[in-house]
C-alpha cells in the first residue's frame, strides 16, 4: 500500500505529530483529538510505502492506522530522552574528596 500523507505538528506538545492521508486531510480525525492536539500546523507531506523507514514510528502501524481510522498520532518520546546525560567523571567533579 502506498499513501501520500500530510504530517501536522501540535502547537501544544513538542514532537507530537498527526499523520493523515493527504486526500482526506483532517476530515477523519475525531473532534476530541483535534481539540486536545491544538490547531494542526502543517509540517510536510510524505509518500509512505511499506519499505520506507521512519525515524520513530513503525511504518506498518502508521499505514494500518491511516487505512483503518484515517489518522496516526505520533506521541512525543518519554521525557528522559530529552535529558542530555553527562559522563560520570563530570558528575563527580564537585564531589568532596
Curated annotation (Swiss-Prot):
It comes from Azotobacter vinelandii (strain DJ / ATCC BAA-1303). HAMAP family: UPF0745 (MF_01866). InterPro entries: YcgL-like_sf, YcgL_dom. Gene3D superfamilies: YcgL domain (3.10.510.20). Pfam families: YcgL (PF05166). This is YcgL domain-containing protein Avin_32960. It comes from the Bacteria. Residues 3-87 form the YcgL domain.
